[in-house]
Amino acid sequence: MTGGNRGVGREVCRQLALLGFGVVLGSRDLRKGELAAKELDPEGNRIAACQLEVDNSVSVAAMADWVKGRFGRTDVLVNNASTMYDRWATASNADLGTVAEAIDVNLFGPWRVIHALLPMLRSSSRPRIVNVSSEGGSIATMTGGSPSYGISKAGLNALTRLLAGELARDGILVNAVCPGWPDSEAHPGGRSLAQAAASVIWAVTIPNGGPSGTFTRDAQLFPW
């Protein structure tokens, strides 16, 4: 789980541990990751924290080596880490440096992690890749705001489709999910964390032979 120390990522870690999964909680700040893991799993039986910066190839490679050395396997990858909800910007006035930073984290970040973990995923009997996207990445519903975030998430959706087609022969199911905005000061009246996490859990737990290459919310297709 990338970006697992807070918000929806943290809740997904909690729910996966309750379902019996062994969870690697990736966090840019290892101390915060270790604190989250301790709070979610005081006995340390199900959740282990790992330092991970998805925009840093060295960090991603170190994470993959650590996972292989400690667990020897990866069955599920949830790409949750993201950045730059630039609701103040429009496509006509966006700072392209900011756009590049968002793409590096929100698109290239998951891509790096997939490359690093793919050998272990290919060896799994039940491999899954879940890319946490957003309605902001839905081309069908885009308007004029948040260009960095929207374009990077639309790219993540495209990557989901490409990988689903390529990796079908390996039995790897690749899906994108839109968890919806959780309730917060920035988004009052949003979904509970449990509701938002449910879409991710669904994509993790679908059986072999299930759907791949989809973009869903609450297990229902969402407009591309």
Residue ranges and their predicted role:
Residues 1-24:
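Canonical Rossmann dinucleotide-binding motif of NAD(H)/NADP(H)-dependent dehydrogenases/reductases
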Residues 19-35:
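Conserved glycine-rich Rossmann-like NAD(P)H-binding loop of the short-chain dehydrogenase/reductase
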Residues 30, 51-62:
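The beta1-alpha1 cofactor-binding region of Rossmann-like NAD(H)/NADP(H)-dependent oxidoreductases
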Residues 45-46, 66-79, 85-87, 173, ...:
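A glycine-rich helix->loop->beta "capping" turn
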Residues 78, 113-117, 121, 159-160, ...:
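Hydrophobic positions on the long internal alpha-helix
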Residues 83-103, 111, 122-169:
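Catalytic loop of short-chain dehydrogenase/reductase
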Residues 169, 176-179, 184-224:
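C-terminal helical subdomain
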